[in-house]
Amino acid sequence: MRRELLLEKIETYKAIMPWYVLDYYQSKLAVPYSFTTLYEYLKEYKRFFDWLMDADLTQAPKIADIDLSTLEHLTKKDLEAFVLYLRERPSLNTYSTKEGLSQTTINRTLSALSSLYKYLTEEVENDQGEPYFYRNVMKKVSTKKKKETLASRAENIKQKLFLGDETLAFLDYVDKEYEQKLSNRAKSSFRKNKERDLAIISLLLASGVRLSEAVNLDLKDVNLNMMIIEVIRKGGKRDSVNVAGFAKGYLESYLAVRQRRYKAEKQDLAFFLTEYRGVPNRMDASSIEKMVGKYSEDFKIRVTPHKLRHTLATRLYDATKSQVLVSHQLGHSSTQVTDLYTHIVNDEQKNALDNL
C-alpha cells in the first residue's frame, strides 16, 4: 500500500476510535512502531469493538464512546467468546470456502489486543502516575500455535526457495528471457520497469531484508560503494545490512534510470519508485508482492518476497554454517528462528549424498 494511502486509511480508523486508543497510537508511534503495524492493529481494534457492541457487552452507541470500564471488566469467558466468534464467523474473503478466520489471523488479533491491554494496565500513566486500570484479562487468554516440526516446515518451504545456481538463474531469466513471451503491449510496460524490478528482486535475494524494509528504503539509506543499506527493523531499531555483491550491477542500472524514467525530483526520497500520470510515488508492498509473484511463477513456482528472504538465509547458512551470522543478517536477536535453515541445508546435503 502506498504510504499516502496508508496514512489516509490510518486517519479514517483514528477518527472512530476511543480516546485511549489514540493515546496508545501516539505512544507506539514514538517507539516507533511502523505505520503498517499500527494500521493493522487499528483494524483489529475496530473488529473487536464492533463485536463488543454486537454482543451487547457495551451500551455505547458507537466505537468512540466505549469506555475504559468496559475493557477493565471483560471476563476471560467474554474473550473466549470473541475467539469463538472469530473462528466461526463467515469469511469475508469471497474466494475462500473456509468458515471463520485462520489461527494465524486470530493470533494476530489477540496479539494486537494484548498490546493494547498491556499499555492500559502497565505502560500508561494518569495524573497520579498510575495506569488506567490494573486488571489485564488478556493474560488469561491463551493462543494456539500451529503445530509443525522444523523438519516438516523445512520440507514444505524448500521447494519455494531459489537455492544454489537458481538465485542468479532467476535474475537472468527476468533479465533475458521473460520478455520473449510477452505481447508487444506487455513488452512496453516490462521494459519501463525492468531495471527497477531487477533491482528489487536482487536486493531481496542479496540482503534478506523484509518486504516492509525494502519498501521504506530511501535514497540516503543505500551505499553502493560499501554495499550496505540502512533499514528500520521490527520494533523501530535502525540497522545496517550488508548486501551481496551480485546485486550491485542491478542496483546501479536502476539508479541510472530512476530520475528520468520515474520523473523523480529532489523531494522524492523513496528508493523504489512507481510513476502514474507523471507523478512519482513510493512503490508499495502489494505491488512488489505481485511483481515477485509474477516473475517467479513464470520462472519456476510462485513465491512471495518473504521466500526470497528465506532463500538468502538458507544460502548464507550453507556457506558459513553460522546461525549467529544468519540471525544478524536477518535482524533477529536470537538464533532460535534460524534453526529452520539448518534443517533445509541438512536436507540438501543428504540429497547431494544420495546422488553420488
Swiss-Prot record:
The subcellular localization recorded is:
Cytoplasm
Q: Which domain of life is it from?
A: Bacteria
For this entry, list what GO says about its biological process. Answer: cell division; chromosome segregation; DNA recombination
Principal localization reads cytoplasm
Question: Which keywords describe this protein according to UniProt?
Answer: Cell cycle, Cell division, Chromosome partition, Cytoplasm, DNA integration, DNA recombination, DNA-binding
**GO MF entry, a single one:** DNA binding
The Core-binding (CB) domain covers 16-121
- InterPro entries, sorted: CB (IPR044068), DNA_brk_join_enz (IPR011010), Integrase-like_cat_sf (IPR013762), Integrase_catalytic (IPR002104), Integrase_recombinase_N (IPR010998), Integrase_SAM-like_N (IPR004107), Recomb_XerS (IPR023670), Tyrosine_recombinase_XerCD (IPR050090)
Spell out the CDD domains in the cross-references.
Answer: DNA_BRE_C
| Activity regulation (UniProt) | FtsK is required for recombination.
Residue ranges constituting the Tyr recombinase domain according to the UniProt record: 169-354
Catalytic site: 210, 234, 306, 309, 332, 341
Q: Give Gene Ontology CC terms.
A: cytoplasm
Task: Respond yes or no to whether keyword DNA-binding is given for this record.
Answer: yes
Q: What does this protein do?
A: Site-specific tyrosine recombinase, which acts by catalyzing the cutting and rejoining of the recombining DNA molecules. Essential to convert dimers of the bacterial chromosome into monomers to permit their segregation at cell division.
The record's family statement is: Belongs to the 'phage' integrase family. XerS subfamily.
Q: Which NCBIfam families match?
A: PRK05084.1
Designated name of the protein: Tyrosine recombinase XerS
UniProt source species: Streptococcus pyogenes serotype M6 (strain ATCC BAA-946 / MGAS10394)
- Gene label: xerS
